[in-house]
């Protein structure tokens, strides 16, 4: 394939309404997460959890300190910005967010993410946002931080096609950042041709398939709402408002289990 993936980046840029120069593609979002963490070499990283365990596994390989900020169940796993900012240690230099989050299916709205990026920018904290599930959100524009990457250079948004496009075997992910210096560092350390030609070809077709995108979103949003309301009406369960394609449920009846 084209070593620079010029055509693919152009298609992604049109899909995300962003400059192709801000895009890096990789062998799944996992490769890009690993690259970002290894290149940032964070002395102290903060992970908002509970969340995907791969972040901490990659962080452990760099030898830095890993800290956690846990979302609170009594707030329905929605982030309390005031408490979050107050509890953040001064020496944190990398913040990792999954948005919408796995496994809580909660989400940080774009307006709150802007406050987070401003707060972090003032403290030289780089932010990684994993948006693997964002295309399932009821309103993508309300959640995605891609529009903020032009304004802030202390952030990289990472996405993949495994979930929304049901194509985990392609191993295709992409990242977006306006930090050209960091982007160059990623490209220098990334293996050449890390994305195979089949994935590059399929990626271009995926992002242009408006029919699939609309049909899938309509189905997921409709079924999610139906399931959420049904579970809410069951006294033995408590469901938390979902933004992804899954619902976190607490079992309230002691005699019941998840099996």
PLM regions with names:
Residues 78-91, 103-127, 131-164:
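Active-site pre-lysine segment of PLP-dependent enzymes
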Residues 67-70, 94-101, 127-131, 240-242:
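Short beta-strands and strand-loop turn motifs
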Residues 4, 154-233, 237-240:
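PLP-dependent aminotransferase class I/II
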Residues 1-11, 27, 100, 195:
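A structural motif shared across PLP-dependent enzymes of the aminotransferase-like
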Residues 29-30, 52, 99-103, 133-134, ...:
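Short glycine-rich anion-binding loops that position phosphate/pyrophosphate groups of nucleotides
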Residues 13-35:
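Short loop-beta-helix segment that forms the pyridoxal 5′-phosphate
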Residues 6, 10, 31, 38-97:
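PLP-dependent aminotransferase-like
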Residues 232-238, 246-259:
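Conserved C-terminal alpha-helix-loop-beta "cap" of PLP-dependent enzymes
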